[in-house]
């Protein structure tokens, strides 16, 4: 404790603030945050490998982009995959896998939310994977100049289930949600599906967007009361169980969170 007080006295000063921020960002990476990139760099490939070994029957990919996540599941298991992607350019690339996996891959050019209709989706043409339904996207400094948008069809998973009742006879292993800050609304619009079909895993991307929407992991955990909370690390096959009530697990930095059915 005395040693900590000495460090406090030396470094808890405005002079060292910028240096301390750099150190904080480094520590956050060591804690599993901010590992952007492909499935391997984020650690998702290790999680997906685990899923595929469990012989999944149905996986749902929301915010499928160009299909890397869906493709991995299709290539490494016999699971059916339902993929949703609202951006037309990305959807066309995603749809190409339909030719190879026509009996197991079902693609939909629409966004998933808590309401049905049509909505603007804001996009950076150079980085379409950053596209979001939320106007809060412009509060993030690297997206503040985003002016382009498309109008897309918006659906809910509950409504999708009503029109695809064959899913009621199947077991959903995984729902993956990567919607750039819109994850909470997706889950709100899937309450009945989650209640009836009890998917084993629900994966969300948790990031800076949620700060501006006042949605933290604790709020997600209250919505998914029957699920335990875990975190993906980039170099570990195992998931780390975390306590969503703890502030150290609620940093608004990029991470992949897994909700596992209790």
What feature does the model see in each segment?
Residues 1-262:
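Phosphate/nucleotide-binding beta-alpha loop and adjacent structural elements of enzyme active sites
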């Amino acid at each position: 404790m005395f040693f900590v007080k000495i460090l406090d006295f030396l470094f808890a000063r405005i002079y060292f603030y910028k240096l301390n921020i750099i150190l904080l960002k480094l520590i956050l990476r060591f804690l599993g945050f901010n590992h952007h990139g492909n499935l391997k760099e984020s650690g998702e490939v290790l999680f997906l490998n685990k899923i595929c070994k469990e012989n999944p029957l149905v996986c749902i990919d929301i915010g499928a982009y160009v299909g890397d996540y869906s493709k991995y599941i299709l290539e490494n298991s016999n699971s059916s995959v339902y993929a949703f992607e609202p951006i037309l350019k990305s959807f066309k690339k995603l749809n190409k896998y339909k030719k190879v996996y026509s009996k197991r891959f079902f693609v939909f050019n629409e966004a998933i939310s808590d309401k049905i209709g049509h909505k603007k989706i804001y996009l950076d043409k150079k980085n379409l994977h950053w596209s979001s339904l939320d106007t809060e996207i412009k509060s993030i400094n690297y997206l503040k100049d985003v002016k382009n948008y498309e109008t897309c069809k918006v659906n809910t998973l509950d409504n999708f289930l009503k029109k695809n009742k064959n899913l009621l006879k199947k077991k959903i292993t995984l729902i993956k949600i990567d919607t750039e800050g819109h994850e909470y609304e997706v889950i709100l619009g899937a309450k009945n599906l989650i209640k009836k079909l009890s998917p084993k895993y629900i994966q969300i991307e948790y990031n800076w967007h949620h700060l501006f929407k006042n949605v933290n992991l604790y709020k997600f955990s209250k919505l998914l009361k029957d699920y335990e909370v875990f975190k993906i690390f980039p170099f570990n096959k195992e998931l780390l169980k975390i306590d969503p009530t703890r502030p150290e697990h609620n940093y608004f930095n990029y991470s992949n969170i897994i909700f596992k059915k209790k």
